[in-house]
Amino acid sequence: MEPPQHQHHHHQADQESGNNNNNKSGSGGYTCRQTSTRWTPTTEQIKILKELYYNNAIRSPTADQIQKITARLRQFGKIEGKNVFYWFQNHKARERQKKRFNGTNMTTPSSSPNSVMMAANDHYHPLLHHHHGVPMQRPANSVNVKLNQDHHLYHHNKPYPSFNNGNLNHASSGTECGVVNASNGYMSSHVYGSMEQDCSMNYNNVGGGWANMDHHYSSAPYNFFDRAKPLFGLEGHQEEEECGGDAYLEHRRTLPLFPMHGEDHINGGSGAIWKYGQSEVRPCASLELRLN
């Protein structure tokens, strides 16, 4: 018979061996129960799902439909109901994203030459460019030029004065005076800055007369259409009219471009130039020019 101490050691060894067996069996059972939950669809399963989505128009299947589809697809591989549900959800999201991407590409406007020309024409104004191609600055407020200012404004088909050897001559016996580049309403700013002009007309049907013109130069911007209208002489009596308005009655201006005569034509250095108009049937419109 063994002593009690030896019995206690045997019992302790049996307990340790039992614990080791239980741990091994437990660990082995855990590894056997651990399975992969990721679904790997087969080709037949994907084909059937796409037929249901596109041909049968099934976008969000119900619970009964999911069970039936799962039972049908299980014949071709391992699958669960949640795999069917998530496949429809993901496929529907991809379709929405694809439509959105295609829609943004289709709605993007293409920059065609016609649209570019139309955009350029919207910002182009003929009064802001002179014939040398140098752009002029647009005024702060758009100026609406009224061309129908009674009968005093000239039509574009009438002859305009031209410079020949320093003299300003009229092509015909009209009464236009000092209208330079009137087709666009503005004088080009590249010729000695801004210039202003005025003219005096002396209508003589009987004898000669003197026309006085004082020279005053200004550097303010000038628009020919802002000036007052010239008046025409009537009934054969002598009248002295000017192209300026009431504000220019005392100060009449001419173009400060080129000198026409020597110093002997200047009366006393006062800036006034006198010219004798011969007695003719047509009116005498004289316009003298000086450098600034």
Swiss-Prot record:
What induces or represses expression of this protein, per its UniProt record?
A: Repressed by the CLV (CLV1, CLV2 and CLV3) proteins, possibly to rapidly down-regulate WUS expression in apical daughter cells after cell divisions, suggesting the existence of a feedback loop. Repressed by AG at the end of floral development. Down-regulated by ULT1, probably to establish floral meristem determinacy.
Q: What PROSITE patterns does the record point to?
A: HOMEOBOX_2
Q: Where is this region: Disordered?
A: 1-40
Gene Ontology biological process = anther development; axillary shoot meristem initiation; cell differentiation; regulation of DNA-templated transcription; stem cell population maintenance; stomium development
Q: Where in the cell is it found?
A: Nucleus
GO MF annotations for this entry? DNA-binding transcription factor activity; transcription cis-regulatory region binding
UniProt keywords (A-Z) are: Activator, Developmental protein, Differentiation, DNA-binding, Flowering, Homeobox, Nucleus, Oogenesis, Transcription, Transcription regulation
Keyword Transmembrane tagged: no
Q: What is its main location?
A: nucleus
Stretches of Basic residues bias are at 1-11
Q: What are the record's GO terms for cellular component?
A: nucleus
Residues annotated as DNA-binding are 34-99
**Residue ranges of coiled coil:** none
Q: Which Pfam families match?
A: Homeodomain
Tissue specificity comment: In the active shoot meristem, it is specifically expressed in a small cell group underneath the presume position of stem cells. Also expressed in the floral meristem. Expressed in the nucellus of ovule primordia.
- Record family assignment: Belongs to the WUS homeobox family.
Q: How does the annotation summarize its subunit structure?
A: Interacts with TPL and TPR4. Interacts with BZIP30.
Function text = Transcription factor that plays a central role during early embryogenesis, oogenesis and flowering, probably by regulating expression of specific genes. Required to specify stem cell identity in meristems, such as shoot apical meristem (SAM). May induce shoot stem cells activity in order to maintain the stem cell identity. Involved in the developmental root meristem. In shoot apices, it is sufficient to induce the expression of CLV3, a putative ligand of the CLV signaling pathway.
Record-given protein name: Protein WUSCHEL
Q: Which species is the source of this protein?
A: Arabidopsis thaliana
